[in-house]
């Protein structure tokens, strides 16, 4: 389970250093094998362990290639999926096309989201957080059933 938001840097080769608190877990659960793809709803990337990505692939394989919307989702997620292996220094090489999609340059936010990480440009991340908070504060107060049951 991944949680928290951490600022990491991309080096000149497009590698990011995985925070040490996650490295052992990634090696133990996935031998450091990861898959990165685009988020189709936000300007960020999604980073999964290979075993977790294989579950996503199974779900995608059950979508119909004859349904245009389902085919688009398959094309976007699978077509951008790129395997990356964590090296001995705990770094992951993020493909240039993926970095371009999310506007990643130097400062990157690594955001834990249960079974995956999101990778955001730092400035874009803080803009998104502000938009999310503003949306929650201006919301009409109508909550989904799941949110009504959420006690914090």
UniProtKB/Swiss-Prot annotation:
It holds the Pfam family MraZ. SUPFAM superfamilies: AbrB/MazE/MraZ-like. It is found in: Cytoplasm, Nucleoid. The gene is mraZ. HAMAP family: MraZ. Keywords: Cytoplasm, DNA-binding, Repeat, Repressor, Transcription, Transcription regulation. Gene3D superfamilies: Transcriptional regulator MraZ domain. Its main location: cytoplasm. GO terms for molecular function: DNA-binding transcription factor activity; transcription cis-regulatory region binding. InterPro entries: MraZ, MraZ_C, MraZ_dom, MraZ_N, MraZ_sf, SpoVT-AbrB_dom, SpoVT-AbrB_sf. Belongs to the MraZ family. It comes from Enterobacter sp. (strain 638). This is Transcriptional regulator MraZ. The lineage of its organism: Bacteria, Pseudomonadati, Pseudomonadota, Gammaproteobacteria, Enterobacterales.
